[in-house]
């Protein structure tokens, strides 16, 4: 094998490696993920280097049929993990519906919810067993509705 052939082979190999690594970092449409035994998996593709069939780790997103973003967040080993944001679908606008964190598929820490008009609706914390501590609920006109201790 000549020097030129080895050089071309090395470049092709590096490109394949780069494409394989980069594809794991790019956000994926969550509707393309496959749910199996409570975990989200990458769809099986013909290109083995993409990590097809593995529990998904990375950023994912969903869109409503209208094209408005529905959700965006990260998965770790097939479970929601990290920051997630959900949106309302309001007349083609993307109004935030809720923001919070997941740990191994469970909501944890501070979560904030908003009405479709953009006003805050509820604020509180989650632990793996559900809502905990003080939760504050608001009316759409910003007035306090109720405070509940869970």
Question: Across the structure, where does each feature detected by a protein language model lie?
Answer:
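Glycine/tyrosine- and acidic-biased, solvent-exposed loop/turn segments at the edges of beta-strands
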Residues: 19-150
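Bacterial N-terminal signal peptides that target proteins for export
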Residues: 2-9
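Bacterial N-terminal signal peptides
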Residues: 10-19
